[in-house]
Amino acid sequence: MYENISTMDDFEFENKWVLLRIDINSTVIDGKIEDDERIKRHLGTIKELMEHDARVAILAHQGRPGEDDFTTLEPHAEIMSEELDNFEYVPDVFGPTAKKKIRSLEPGEVILLENVRFYSEERINRDPEWHARRHLVRNLAPLFDIFVNDAFAAAHRSNASLVGFTRRLPSCVGRVMEREIEVLETMVRDEMEDGVFVIGGSKIEDAIKVIRRAIEMDNVRRVLLGGLVGNLFLWASGVDLGKPSRKFLDMKGYTGYLDEARELLEEGDDVILVPEDVALNRGGEREEVDVDELPADAPVFDIGTGTIERYRKEVESAGMVVANGPMGVYEEPGFEKGTYEVLNAIADSEAFSVIGGGHIIAAAKACGAYDSIDHVSTGGGAMLRMLAGERLPAIDAILTCPFSGC
């Protein structure tokens, strides 16, 4: 799919102004970054550019408007400054302060610009040509020689900072993106047998697309569901979760996916597994019940022990396991069991294993499974969509870049 993508090996960076897009979107609680995995992953690309005497300005985002984690990039800059010399944080995206700093960059220097999602048009999904005419690209592109996109975790989006510069500058992928493409394309191309997808978390839209694709794939044997995804599909299967869980799904706007979930359960009834028992949060205590004992007046916070054992057996006999999203609210004491035990089953299995997404990576570190996973992807939604055979707009934009060297 992406065999001919341009990489950093195709360019000379000495004394060039390089605009680097990375994805350091992280879990932020009370202004503090809880896991710096994504930040650390991009250091290799940044240091390589510095070693080649490039003048580097970095674009990145954090959170979404209206969410608690929609913050400045100052906490990220603090972590990066501990690892990088000649590094500076600039609290501006493309205003006079940012432009002045960019123009004054010396070879081997790096600046991190402000959260690009502070700019409203960044959040619009449009084609590269449309974004190339917007303020962000028109203001920044003339200041640079090369655009490097290393933001694999956001590659399934078609935002201005991800696709627009490919119509104004010679462009390539960075080292993180290159490695992700290499590993995931190999998995798709080789069609590893006895595939098992473990889908949890709360990204319902992404999950629906991947589940639809997975049940069509001959090499995917099972799709195991947990988290809010599992709760939604349980509801769609006819299980009354109880008012607290129904209310939460409705508040998040996920009830609109119930009909699609019902369709998928009918089409993939021999592939999709939903929880057979769950753990309720009753006043902070874990209470396990079979799904036929629902509805409950307490919210569902995890999969139950029976489901864990069932999922463990599926994972143990798999040839390939792909996991995205936790099985429950693993951050809450007592409700990490499903996520941790399924992750440890994946780590202990003989299957080629891939996990992706910020929450499941943090959970894998916490339970000791991280080092036994074959490939830890920086992307959640991007990873799942690529494995499902979907094209990723940010990578396609580089493939169709009209400049020499792209």
UniProtKB/Swiss-Prot annotation:
Q: Which GO terms describe its biological process?
A: gluconeogenesis; glycolytic process
Compartments (UniProt record): Cytoplasm
Q: Which UniProt keywords apply?
A: ATP-binding, Cytoplasm, Glycolysis, Kinase, Nucleotide-binding, Transferase
**Record's catalysed reaction(s):** (2R)-3-phosphoglycerate + ATP = (2R)-3-phospho-glyceroyl phosphate + ADP
Q: Does the keyword Transferase apply?
A: yes
State whether keyword Cytoplasm applies.
yes
A GO CC annotation recorded here is: cytosol
One GO term in the molecular function aspect is: ADP binding
What top-tier enzyme class does this entry carry? transferase
Name the residues that bind ATP. E331, G357, G358, H359, I360
Q: EC number(s) on record?
A: 2.7.2.3
Q: Which Pfam families match?
A: PGK
What's this protein's family per the entry? Belongs to the phosphoglycerate kinase family.
What does the subunit comment say?
Monomer.
Q: What is this protein called?
A: Phosphoglycerate kinase
Q: What is the lineage of its organism?
A: Archaea, Methanobacteriati, Methanobacteriota, Methanomada group, Methanopyri
- By which gene is this protein encoded? pgk
